[in-house]
């Protein structure tokens, strides 16, 4: 199959043999596409190497043969965001998450839209944690894994003052045990869930619980195998 003049975001790049690269690209029309870029070294290929960088929006043409497509041409369509510190790790995170969850050669336009919005959010230096929670929510929705953020697993309206545990299959489970309700490591406030559903940034004190709860749900859909970016973020937090 011939892929011509397709737009996509570079998610991941790694060396293959001595002169080639394996590139994962997220596209709107073809989903996640694996590209084999041959012979990318040398001064005449400098522009191509510069285009094949994570977070970069490119336009490319390729021939699909089996699992990988043979790259014919690629060019950068803009300047990738220059991220440093926490935002750089966040950029790594959004790319790694979709590298793991976006299906190969199966278009999910919602995921392309999620990545576009998250990339813009990172470049604009907006509140980082909130941008990532929105991204996670939208990715789950795009993959068909969304849960009700207005009602709990029993169909009752979520109580802002109560605490809940997010279950990947059942949604928000209200915590009735006083001991568990006080354990903020495993639960999230109803106020935070309602805010997430209404696309309003929760209170600062509710953000850690929301992060942990969303990570637990994502871990389920990742098959129980975490992300390298999570390890990097935790290591950075311990060093501070």
Curated annotation (Swiss-Prot):
InterPro entries: ARFGAP/RecO, DNA_rep/recomb_RecO_N, NA-bd_OB-fold, RecO, RecO_C. Belongs to the RecO family. GO terms for biological process: DNA recombination; double-strand break repair. Disulfide bonds: none annotated. Keywords: DNA damage, DNA recombination, DNA repair. The lineage of its organism: Bacteria, Pseudomonadati, Pseudomonadota, Gammaproteobacteria, Lysobacterales. One of its GO terms (cellular component) is bacterial nucleoid. SUPFAM superfamilies: ArfGap/RecO-like zinc finger (SSF57863), Nucleic acid-binding proteins (SSF50249). It comes from Xanthomonas oryzae pv. oryzae (strain KACC10331 / KXO85). Involved in DNA repair and RecF pathway recombination. It comes from the Bacteria. NCBIfam families: reco. PANTHER family: DNA REPAIR PROTEIN RECO (PTHR33991:SF1). This is DNA repair protein RecO.
